[in-house]
Amino acid sequence: AFKQLSKIYDTYVLSAAPWENPSAWSDKLNWVKNYLGKEAYKRLILSHNKHLNSGDYLIDDRKANGAEHFPGQHIYFGKDEFPDWKSVCDYLISQSI
């Protein structure tokens, strides 16, 4: 999904990690490197204040860490309207036309 949407949008990976688990930060970075590749590696933002980032869309499976106050549209991943990545990609591709 990241690679597909990156062809259309200026995409970033915005994630939070527990403060009390320092290895979680490096674990997230390694996960992005391994699964999303070098294109995403330098587009990783780790923040507990997601609402401070600007953008048109935030895809998140939670409303925590500022997602509920994000200034663009929060695509609530895993819920009724967006149960999977196909539904998210289909929606975002339709919005780009």
Which residues make up each language-model segment?
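Surface-exposed, flexible loop/turn segments at secondary-structure boundaries
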Residues: 19, 52, 82
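Asp-based, Mg2+/Mn2+-dependent phosphohydrolase catalytic module
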Residues: 56-57, 62-97
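Donor nucleotide-activated moiety binding/catalytic core segment of transferases
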Residues: 37-56
